């Protein structure tokens, strides 16, 4: 456990009233085989009231975002009892309401340390079930993800015009992994993938990681209650305002914490995802895929996925064993998108990798 901090200055930051250290709390559970691979679960340790510049008024932030922080601590309590191949980080990020400063600082730190981040699960508001729209729902939740990394090359961007992949970036694959894990292990829940970086025009602490090319998503409640969000505690015209603990549903928070736990455990136990995944098959009645293989003691085999180009989820799959290439006979490349994952002997599976290279 350690503190990671950066000095944020008032100059140039309209939401910062004075120079201050933005301090994150970071706890690392080291992996046994791949300690430099990290899956991160984050909550936020800051809050705000109606006026973001008012740092003296009470701003309990029970749902936004004590719930995310409580989830990270509870996940650490549960998962720390197990050993994983990859490392897990549980982190409390600061300065989110003032400009995503904590996430930006940790993302820079990760870059400087050469961390290989497998994914960031940003939990920001995971405890409210009663929306301002009148809906009460304790089973659904949202998974926000950007389509492709902003750091991708111009060559990759041009290539996508001809070969596809507009909705298949690394963060979108991470979102699909969360969706699939939930459907498999928590079928009572209804995960909603939202094809958007975050809520309309808004931001969260996964974005600074996305900005530098790391996969990251936001996990949160489906129905927000704006009367309880960024509000001074008060009563107006019979309406209660303020983010207090009475607005938190602990059973729901527990469910979304479990979603994080099964996602992190799945990734942290699984083999590393395939690398150099390539595809070919133009004007042929079959699709060819290839990838770099891991040593036999690190992986049991590989699984090829495909889906209709309009489908949000991977709907078809075939386990092909411990091979480095495979041809799907009778599957025309034009009609589907494809991906490859790595699987261990216990069935733990990596995030699916979309091909970014061509077989000539």
Task: State what each model feature region is.
Residues 328-350:
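Beta-strand-rich modules
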Residues 285-298:
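Conserved aromatic anchor
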Residues 316-323:
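Short beta-strand segments within Ig-like beta-sandwich modules, predominantly Fibronectin type-III
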Residues 1-30:
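A non-catalytic alpha/beta surface segment that caps or lines the substrate-entry region
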Residues 27, 41, 46-47, 52-100, ...:
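Alpha-helical metal-binding/catalytic segments enriched in His/Glu/Asp
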Residues 301-304:
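Short beta-strand elements bearing conserved aromatic residues within extracellular beta-rich modules
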Residues 126-146, 193-269:
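Active-site-adjacent mobile loop/cap segments within catalytic or ligand-binding domains
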Residues 93-204:
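Metal-dependent peptidase/peptidase-like ectodomains
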């Amino acid at each position: 456990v350690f503190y990671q901090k950066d000095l944020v200055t008032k100059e140039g930051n309209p939401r910062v009233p004075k120079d201050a250290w933005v301090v994150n709390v970071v706890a690392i559970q080291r992996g046994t085989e791949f300690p430099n691979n990290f899956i991160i679960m984050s909550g936020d340790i800051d809050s705000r009231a109606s006026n973001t510049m008012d740092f003296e008024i009470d701003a309990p932030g029970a749902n936004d975002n004590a719930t995310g922080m409580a989830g990270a601590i509870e996940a650490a309590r549960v998962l720390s009892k197990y050993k994983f191949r990859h490392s897990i980080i549980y982190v409390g990020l600061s300065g989110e309401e003032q400009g995503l400063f904590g996430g930006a600082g940790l993302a820079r730190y990760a870059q400087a340390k050469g961390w290989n981040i497998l994914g960031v699960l940003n939990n920001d508001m995971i405890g409210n079930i009663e929306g301002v729209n009148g809906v009460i729902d304790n089973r659904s939740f949202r998974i926000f993800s950007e389509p492709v990394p902003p750091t991708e090359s111009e060559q990759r961007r041009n290539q996508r015009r001809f070969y596809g992949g507009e909705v298949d970036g690394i963060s979108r694959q991470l979102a699909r992994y969360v969706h699939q894990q939930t459907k498999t292990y928590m079928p009572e829940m209804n995960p909603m993938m939202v094809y958007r970086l975050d809520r309309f025009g808004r931001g969260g602490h996964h974005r600074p990681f996305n900005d530098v090319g790391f996969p990251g998503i936001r996990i949160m409640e489906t129905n927000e209650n704006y009367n309880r969000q960024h509000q001074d505690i008060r009563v107006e015209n019979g309406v209660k305002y303020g983010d207090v603990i009475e607005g938190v549903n602990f059973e729901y928070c527990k469910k979304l914490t479990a979603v994080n736990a099964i996602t992190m455990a799945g990734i942290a136990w699984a083999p590393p995802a395939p690398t150099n995944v390539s595809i070919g098959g133009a004007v042929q009645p079959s699709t060819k895929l290839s990838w770099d293989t891991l040593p036999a003691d690190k992986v049991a085999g590989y699984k090829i996925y495909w889906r209709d180009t309009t489908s949000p989820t991977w709907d078809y799959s075939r386990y092909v064993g411990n091979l480095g290439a495979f041809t799907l006979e009778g599957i025309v490349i034009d009609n589907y998108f494809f991906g490859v994952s790595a699987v261990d002997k216990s069935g733990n599976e990596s995030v699916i990798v979309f091909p970014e290279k061509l077989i000539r």
